[in-house]
Regions:
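Histidine/lysine/aspartate-rich catalytic loop segments that bind and position anionic ligands
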Residues: 125-129, 133, 141-172, 177
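Active-site beta-loop-alpha junctions enriched in small/polar residues
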Residues: 69-71, 101-103, 126-130, 153-155, ...
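Hydrophobic faces of well-ordered beta-strands that scaffold small-molecule active sites
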Residues: 64-66, 96-98, 121-125, 148-152, ...
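Conserved Radical SAM active-site core
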Residues: 2-121, 130-133, 159-163, 167-170, ...
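A general structural detector for well-ordered alpha-helical segments in enzyme core domains, enriched
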Residues: 80-87, 136-139, 190-194
Length: 271
């Protein structure tokens, strides 16, 4: 079971992958400014919230993706992060996926009792091209952690990560194309290369989305957001191979015609 926890919202664009940030796009659709960074009111303490029966709303065994509309190691969030670490410390039965582009800030902002890592935390860095992979992956490899991963999203070039995968420290690699208002293409050969590298190193690889523009055999395919994960899974490029029968995005509850956006708050603007 995978869910999202956004203890704060908003971010500052940091590198090439941020040029067409999905969070900025979705905030624009809601007449909001994605660069406005704030602590969320209702969900800040989500892992500790309980229902009327006294049970945690985030169930034991959940994979909780943290800060998907921000960056966990954002400078502006320094004043809130210790509270979040404390909540993570209290929920050892939940796995927290912590993803960042700011790899150089990780080591100095881990909790004092981090030691050689926490069993319920996966540290993940995003690397959109070879330059960022060569910058960020060595930093993450030098940080003590029980679980590490990296994500190539939006993937903007072929990425050779053989030397990093060969360390045996990475458990999982993910790749996604650029979506929402971005049109920089994702190429089949880039994904196939990552698949082959991960297969050789016996590291899990998940191709999670084609992006808006997917190029294969010299032909560019424009793929609607609702079909991008479906097409990625049907490609057979994940490793190990997995079930390709995945659900489509739900339809907007108002217009019933268009697919709802990720993180939809039913604003009605898809009409």
């Amino acid at each position: 079971m995978m869910q999202i926890w956004n203890p704060w919202h908003g971010c500052r664009k940091y590198s090439e992958g941020c040029d067409h940030c999905y969070m900025y796009y979705l905030d624009t659709q809601r007449d909001r400014d994605g660069s406005e960074i704030y602590k969320t009111k209702t969900n800040f303490n989500l892992p500790l919230k309980k229902d009327r029966q006294g049970n945690y709303k985030i169930q034991s065994g959940t994979l909780l993706h943290v800060c998907m509309t921000s960056d966990f190691f954002l400078e502006e969030a320094d004043k809130w992060r210790e509270e979040v670490w404390d909540m993570i410390r209290q929920r050892l039965d939940v796995t927290f996926w912590i993803q960042t582009k700011r790899a150089e800030r990780i080591a100095e902002h881990l909790p004092k009792d981090w030691g050689d890592g926490w069993e319920n935390v996966i540290l993940c860095v995003t690397t959109e091209n070879q330059k960022r992979a060569d910058e960020r992956l060595p930093i993450l490899l030098d940080i003590p952690a029980k679980h590490t991963a990296f994500m190539c999203a939006p993937i903007l070039s072929e990425i050779h990560a053989e030397q990093y995968l060969a360390t045996g420290q990475f458990e999982r690699v993910l790749a996604d194309g650029e979506n929402y208002d971005g049109t920089r293409p994702c190429r089949y050969e880039w994904i196939k290369s990552l698949h082959d590298q991960c297969e050789y190193a016996n590291v899990e690889f998940d191709f999670i989305g084609t992006g808006n523009i997917f190029i294969k055999d010299g032909k560019a395919y424009r793929i609607p957001k609702a079909y991008q994960r479906v097409q990625a899974q049907r490609s057979g490029l994940s490793y190990p191979s997995r079930n390709t029968d995945i659900p489509m995005q739900p339809k907007c509850r108002f217009c019933k015609r268009k697919n709802s956006c990720n993180g939809c708050n039913w604003c009605g603007k898809c009409d």
